[in-house]
Swiss-Prot record:
Its main location: cytoplasm. It comes from Lactococcus lactis subsp. lactis (strain IL1403). This is 4-hydroxy-tetrahydrodipicolinate synthase. Belongs to the DapA family. Catalyzes the condensation of (S)-aspartate-beta-semialdehyde [(S)-ASA] and pyruvate to 4-hydroxy-tetrahydrodipicolinate (HTPA). GO terms for cellular component: cytosol. It comes from the Bacteria.
Length: 297
């Protein structure tokens, strides 16, 4: 699929869920938990899926496990919504080889590539890293700027430079409204700007961005859908009221390191997503109680 075709497909994907990875008690992937979870997400307005991203605990997944997840989810989704695969690491060579492998699958619509973590590259190093990934195959690439987890930030000037590459089509921006507003204003109109911060979904859409790549949409997809619909109709005050209503729930989902809270909630709702792989740990009994009280029914 060409960059242009993927952009067209993503035009209808405003609410993209960063999918959790279900685990069994022995720590192996629980593939049997995917069908119900995914079907319910689609029924509640998930319009795209991120596979093997941060919420999926990608640092503790092997590439073989990631490929198995891609295949399993693709079989369930069957072309109904776009699939975006996490393809980036802090090793450029490894990322290049993996994006080539993912591109050959034929059913992944785009790759999500995170800023290199731990290495602390310069802006030129960041640019060259993403350029190597974007030019390694014909798989369109979405930049992932999340300095809160990786320390290093892709500066807005570097993002504008990367946007000139034909195969770089979008960004998951996890910084602030100032950067979001600047990027939405300065980037090409067909370049898709998503926030990766659930609490900024309203701001991003109201500023003219594409939407949200979300953790909270596992349980708040309907609310995001209604909020975006109000914005599209020019009813900013009604949209803002929805934002204010869901914000305490969003905050609860990030009260301890994600994805522990969302897994707590999903398990409570019967989705059998299990625990987390070390070094991440599940919420404590007290943390779970507080989170579930704030989420409600």
């Amino acid at each position: 699929m060409s960059a242009k075709e993927t952009i067209e497909k993503l035009q209808n994907a405003r609410i993209i869920t960063a999918l959790v990875t279900p685990f069994k008690e022995n720590g192996q992937i629980n593939f049997g938990a995917f069908p119900k979870l995914i079907e319910d997400l689609l029924a509640n307005h998930t319009e795209g899926l991120i596979l093997a991203g941060t919420t999926a605990e990608s640092p503790t997944l092997t590439h073989d496990e990631e490929l198995a997840i891609f295949a399993a989810v693709n079989k369930i989704v069957d072309g109904r919504i776009p699939l975006i695969a996490g393809v980036g690491t802090n090793d450029t060579r490894d990322s290049v080889e993996f994006v080539k492998e993912v591109a050959e699958l034929g059913y992944i619509d785009a790759g999500l590539a995170v800023t290199p973590y731990y290495n602390k590259p310069s802006q030129e190093g960041i640019y060259q890293h993403f350029k190597a990934i974007a030019t390694a195959s014909d798989l369109p690439i979405i930049l992932y700027n999340i300095p809160g987890r990786v320390v290093t930030e892709i500066q807005v000037e570097t993002i504008l430079r990367l946007a000139e590459l034909e195969n770089v089509i979008a960004i998951k921006e996890c910084t602030n409204t100032d950067n979001l507003a600047y990027l939405i204003e300065k980037l090409p109109k067909d370049f898709l700007v998503y926030t990766g911060e659930d609490g900024l979904a309203f701001h991003t859409k109201a500023l003219g961005g594409q939407g949200v790549i979300s953790v909270a949409s596992h349980i708040l997809g309907q609310e995001f859908f209604e909020m975006f619909a109000e914005i599209d109709q020019g009813s900013i005050q009604k949209a803002a009221a929805i934002q204010r209503k869901i914000l305490p729930k969003i905050n609860a989902l990030f009260s301890v390191t994600s994805p522990a809270p969302i897994k707590t909630v999903l398990n409570a709702k019967g989705y059998e997503v299990g625990g987390l792989r070390l070094p991440l740990v599940a919420c404590t009994t007290e943390e779970s109680k507080i989170i579930l009280e704030k989420i409600g029914n």
